[in-house]
């Protein structure tokens, strides 16, 4: 994620017109979410609370959004790391206030960003049962044990709106297929453990 430009920092200076720290805190919280940026209500609140034009409010919210996203994306968790993002000539008290507010909320924002990222469908439930499948042909009658595996899969919420789509998939596995699958899952587990321990 690209660093902030001089224009972004100039837009952030509009926060000096805020009547209280709570106004700055509220704008930081509201501007983190991408969906909130286009809301007319947020623009109107920003215009009235800071006495700025619509254009200045948009630039400020974009700058705040970019700053908070950058901190969450880079996983900056110390005041020093966040302060280093600001230019030297940036208003000292505003810089300190923004850093304090960001530190208060960065872990929540990271969790929100991770939950909202576009991803592959997720496995939400897994169930199985063992059945005896009988088959008959002219040669002999056979009873073959099989595993019926039912997986419930949730589509990415950002792609399907407010109501996440959950679908069920049922597969039938022979003992040989199940053995191969378990062997492959064991290797995946070993690789994940190796990566996690690095």
Curated annotation (Swiss-Prot):
Residue span, COMM domain: 122-196
Transmembrane segments: none
Residues bearing the modification N-acetylalanine: 2
Signal peptide extent: none
Keywords, sorted A to Z: Acetylation, Cytoplasmic vesicle, Ion transport, Nucleus, Sodium, Sodium transport, Transcription, Transcription regulation, Transport, Ubl conjugation pathway
Tissue expression from the record: Ubiquitous.
GO-annotated biological processes: cholesterol homeostasis; sodium ion transport
Protein origin, superkingdom: Eukaryota
GO cellular component: cytosol; extracellular region; ficolin-1-rich granule lumen; Golgi apparatus; nucleoplasm; secretory granule lumen
Pfam families assigned to the protein according to its UniProt record, in alphabetical order: COMM_domain (PF07258), COMMD9_HN (PF20923)
Subcellular location: Nucleus; Cytoplasmic vesicle
Function comment: Scaffold protein in the commander complex that is essential for endosomal recycling of transmembrane cargos; the commander complex is composed of the CCC subcomplex and the retriever subcomplex. May modulate activity of cullin-RING E3 ubiquitin ligase (CRL) complexes. May down-regulate activation of NF-kappa-B. Modulates Na(+) transport in epithelial cells by regulation of apical cell surface expression of amiloride-sensitive sodium channel (ENaC) subunits.
Quaternary state and interactors: Component of the commander complex consisting of the CCC subcomplex and the retriever subcomplex. Component of the CCC (COMMD/CCDC22/CCDC93) subcomplex consisting of COMMD1, COMMD2, COMMD3, COMMD4, COMMD5, COMMD6, COMMD7, COMMD8, COMMD9, COMMD10, CCDC22 and CCDC93; within the complex forms a heterodimer with COMMD7. Interacts with RELB and NFKB1/p105. Interacts with CCDC22, CCDC93, SCNN1B, CUL1.
Similarity comment: Belongs to the COMM domain-containing protein 9 family.
Protein name: COMM domain-containing protein 9
Record lineage: Eukaryota, Metazoa, Chordata, Craniata, Vertebrata
């Amino acid at each position: 994620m690209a660093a902030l430009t001089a224009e972004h920092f100039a837009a952030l200076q509009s926060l000096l017109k805020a009547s209280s720290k709570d106004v700055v805190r509220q704008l930081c919280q509201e501007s983190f979410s991408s969906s909130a940026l286009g809301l007319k209500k947020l623009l109107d609140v920003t215009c009235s609370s800071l006495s700025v034009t619509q254009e200045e409010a948009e630039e400020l919210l974009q700058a705040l959004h970019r700053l908070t996203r950058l901190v969450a994306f880079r996983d900056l968790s110390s005041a020093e790391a966040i302060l280093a993002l600001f230019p030297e000539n940036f208003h000292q008290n505003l810089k300190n206030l923004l850093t304090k507010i960001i530190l208060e909320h960065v872990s929540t924002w990271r969790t929100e960003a991770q939950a909202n990222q576009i991803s592959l469908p997720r496995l939400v439930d897994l169930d199985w049962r063992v059945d005896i499948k009988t088959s008959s042909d002219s040669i002999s009658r056979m009873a073959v044990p099989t595993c019926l595996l039912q997986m419930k899969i949730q589509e990415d919420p950002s792609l399907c709106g407010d109501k996440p789509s959950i679908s069920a998939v049922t597969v039938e596995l022979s003992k040989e297929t199940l053995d191969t699958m378990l062997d492959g899952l064991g290797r995946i587990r070993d690789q994940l453990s190796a990566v996690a321990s690095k």
